[in-house]
Amino acid sequence: MTSALTHLGAQGEANMVDVGDKEETTRTAIAEGFVSMQPETLKTILAGNAKKGDVLGTARIAGIMAAKKTHELIPLCHPLLLTKISVDIEPDHALPGLKVTALARVTGKTGVEMEALTAASVACLTIYDMAKAVDRAMLISGIRLVEKTGGKSGDYKVGA
């Protein structure tokens, strides 16, 4: 693992990395996040009874849309032609709350970690927004990269 920050120039100024000479490869990233909440809030969401509507469906779409706009939200991210983005949301009754998993894929010259992380983050934020009327104490946590494949830096998997 290299310790050099690739987005910094010789004088420490921020710059966008030139990926022009890199090989195109298929790259995949998986990110996750959690929204902890009161058990009653989870029941309301799962029953589809939230006042703002379909929390899970809306959060899924918000995450997908966010992944497609990552380069507009995160400075120095390259715009990517994503070939796949999915957001899965599962109840975790032990939490209690919801687990969000986002997968992003591209065939290109740079990775999709930021797109997966953005999708998971925005899906979690959307869950909070849509259910905050009944539970302002919800907690968003555990946003992290779980796995990535492809590219020069090789593969990564949490715990491996």
Swiss-Prot record:
InterPro entries: MoaC (IPR023045), MoaC_bact/euk (IPR047594), MoaC_sf (IPR036522), MoCo_biosynth_MoaA/MoaC (IPR050105), Mopterin_CF_biosynth-C_dom (IPR002820). Transmembrane segments: none annotated. It is an enzyme of class 4 (lyase). The keyword Lyase applies. It catalyses: (8S)-3',8-cyclo-7,8-dihydroguanosine 5'-triphosphate = cyclic pyranopterin phosphate + diphosphate. The keyword Lyase applies. Its EC number is 4.6.1.17. Pathway: Cofactor biosynthesis; molybdopterin biosynthesis. It comes from the Bacteria. The active site is at 129. GO terms for biological process: Mo-molybdopterin cofactor biosynthetic process. Disulfide bonds: none annotated. GO terms for molecular function: cyclic pyranopterin monophosphate synthase activity. Coiled coil: none annotated. Substrate binds at residues 76-78, 114-115. Keywords: Lyase, Molybdenum cofactor biosynthesis. Homohexamer; trimer of dimers. Belongs to the MoaC family. Catalyzes the conversion of (8S)-3',8-cyclo-7,8-dihydroguanosine 5'-triphosphate to cyclic pyranopterin monophosphate (cPMP). This is Cyclic pyranopterin monophosphate synthase. It comes from Mesorhizobium japonicum (strain LMG 29417 / CECT 9101 / MAFF 303099) (Mesorhizobium loti (strain MAFF 303099)). The gene is moaC.
